Amino acid sequence: MVFVHSVGRSILIFKIYILFSIHLSVSIRFISIFFIVALGVAFFSGIQAASPDMRYSGDSYYDETNLMDLRVMGTLGLTDEDMEALNQVKGVELAEGGYALDVLSGEKGSQQVIHLESLGGSINKLSVIDGRIPEKKGECLIDSQLAGQGAFQMGSEAVFETEDDEDSVLKQKSYTIVGTCSSPMYISFARGHTTLGSGEVSGYAYVTEDNFDQEVYTVAYLLAKGAREQVSYTELYENLVKKVQSRVEGIKEERCQLRYDSVRGKAQQELADGEKELADGKKKARRELEDAKKELSDARKKLEDGRAEYEDGVRQLSDAK
C-alpha cells in the first residue's frame, strides 16, 4: 500500500515537473520571441522616423542659411538687366548674382582644384568655423574640410591660378587665409566635379567681389516664394520649385538673345572702331608721307637754288678778276 502510494506520488510529481518544464520552455520562448519582435519593431520604427527627422533637420539648416532653391548660369554671363528680369519672375522671392570659377592651387604635379566663389549677400549664408569673413581684396575664406587636411592653414598664403593665366578673371593670385567655413551648398564629403586637373574638386574658397575682373556675373542664385514653408525633398517642395523653374526658363530665350545681341554689337563696334582707327592711321600716314615728299621737294629746290646762286657768285667773282 505504501509502495503504491509512493509510485502514485512519484507519477504526480513527474507530471508536475513535465508541465512546469513545458510551461517554463514556452515562457522562455515567448519572452524571446517577444523581445525579438519588439527589437524588430523598434528598429523599424527608428528607420521610419530617421528619414523625416533627417529631412526636418536638414530643412531647418537650409532655412537658417537661406540655401538657394535654383541656380542660373549663362555661357555669356549674366548682366544687371538679367538680374532685374529674374527678380521680376513670378514666384521668385530674391535673385542674387555672383562670380564663380574653378582654380588650381599647389605645386605642379600635385595641384588641387578649388571652387572659388564671391561672397554673397542673403543667399547661401556661410557658417564661419574659425577666424572671420574676408573684408578686403586679397583675403579668402577656406573650406573647413579642406583646412582640416592640412593643405591650408590660417594666416598662410593660398595661391590660386586659372587654366589660362594670360586671360585670368582674377585680379591677383595670392590670398591670405583669414578663416575657415562650412557652406550649405556642400552637405556631403564630395565637393563636385570639374574639367580641370584630376576632374574632382578638392574644396571651396570665398573671396570678396572686387577680386574678380569681370563685367558680368557668372552665376545667379534664386529663392522661391513659399519654399521656406515647405519641407525640402518633399513632393510639395519639388512641385513648387519646378513651377518657378519653368517660369525662369520661359524668359531664357529672350534674355539669351538680348545678351547675344549685346555681345555681338559690342564686338562689331570694337571692330568698326578698329577699322576706323586703321583707316585714320593710313590716311594720316599717307598725309604725312605727302608732306614729307613736299618738304623733300622744297628742300631739293632750295638746294638747287642755292647751288645756282653759288655758281653765279663764283662766276661773278671770276669775271671781276
Model-derived regions, located:
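Membrane transport/envelope proteins' first extracytoplasmic loop
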Residues: F3-K321
